[in-house]
Amino acid sequence: MFAKLENKFNVVDKFNILGTIGLIFALLGIVSVILLPFNVNFFNFDIDFLGGTTMTYDMHTELDKAELDNIAKLVEDASGVAPSSVQKSEGTQVVIKTTTLDTEKRDAVFSALKEAYNLNDGTAKDADGNIIPTDMLSVDNVDPVMGADLRNAAIVSAFLAILCMLIYIAIRFDWRSGLAAIAALAHDVFVVMGAYVVFRIPVNMTFIAVVLTILGYSINATIIIFDRIRENRKVLKKTSFGEIVNKSIWQTATRSLNTTITTLLAVGLIAILGVSSIQNFVIPLIVGIIAGLYSSMFISGPIWAKLIKNSK
């Protein structure tokens, strides 16, 4: 399918352009991370990382986007704090997450929702004199210290995953291929971070699941190409390494593209049919899968070729 492109479009020779394109897409994520130590935050950090209050209510009404937006406005008006997320849960239940609210503000939120949606507060009785259960299902606070612990654990997990991948690739191929793969993985992670900023997706423990999933998906796509490069090196001994890399990329392009399309079809259906909490996982996953396809084809191999060339 892509055999004709092998001679018409040399990926290694075009790396300056392809690498710049990748850098542009990753730039928002890179800048957002760099600015964090300077108290400039573009991310929508959830209470999992910062601490805060989680409130769950049964609204007894269908919760579409308009209703969720209305609930978010009611919460902000009542508490003076914009919620970090308002998500539909089971049935007609809604989960609201904010920065830490004291008892007075939590009561104000419930009063506002009670008035707007005729919620039960646990004092009303039915026709038989039985108390009707309250529609305030739960209120939980996450301590900021616990949030910091979760954040640190997440960073360590991602770092260890990348380190293990680097060691594995360096052993299986060579250390330069390991560096090339890490550069591609970094590209994917920063692109995903940019998606979190653009779509204002809450950054919580789901973020770690997304990142680790993308790392695994991307490294698998990269290893497929690296395997083909290694096999071609055994056969094409008189061919330059750059040409071998280019040939190997286009030889595996059909497989890479088909795998990505198949995965996107499945994940896309989940994004369309799933509730908002699932969509917050799936949307950055879709972005990461596409970024992984790009980096495995147009970043990792060319960087490996450049490192080989510069080491001679």
Give the positions of each predicted feature.
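A structural signal for conserved, well-ordered secondary-structure elements
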Residues: M1-K312
